[in-house]
Amino acid sequence: MMPAKLQLDVLRTLQSSARHGTQTLKNSNFLERFHKDRIVFCLPFFPALFFVPVQKVLQHLCLRFTQVAPYFIIQLFDLPSRHAENLAPLLASCRIQYTNCFSSSSNGQVPSIISLYLRVDLSPFYAKIFQISYRVPMIWLDVFQVFFVFLVISQHSLHS
């Protein structure tokens, strides 16, 4: 299990990572579910992403989450390909995997993520979507949303 001090550090990072704007953590209880083996970030592909400093936000998060790597498998979903190409070395160095599995999805719901882990018994599976809003200093663009999906799979499921 991740040390409590590191959990708090990660929480502070999530709450302060948008140096490029402001954000609101909608669910303050996320640490209750943020404790096993896997974190999945989902960046829904909006046209707005073309106007957002995604690279800077990700660089900041990557630097902070490097120390979490021993405790979690971190996967980043639906990163626009142009950002993925630029950030590939950084993501690899932080042991962060990425995929564009939602690019062809019409709704981008949690089952799309769950389908990637069919080999795992998901009966005690807990998933929660945390909605983070970034205020972007652009003339025509005010806000875009980033959904952090934390998938917590019990240790029993992983070994069954």
UniProtKB/Swiss-Prot annotation:
Membrane topology: Multi-pass membrane protein
Cellular compartments annotated: Membrane
Keywords, ordered alphabetically: Membrane, Transmembrane, Transmembrane helix
Primary location class: membrane
Transmembrane segments: 39-59, 136-156
Gene Ontology CC: membrane
Keyword Transmembrane included in the entry's annotation: yes
Lipid metabolism in keyword set: no
Sequence similarity: Belongs to the UPF0479 family.
Name of the protein in its database record: UPF0479 membrane protein YER190C-B
The species this protein was found in: Saccharomyces cerevisiae (strain ATCC 204508 / S288c)
Upper lineage: Eukaryota, Fungi, Dikarya, Ascomycota, Saccharomycotina
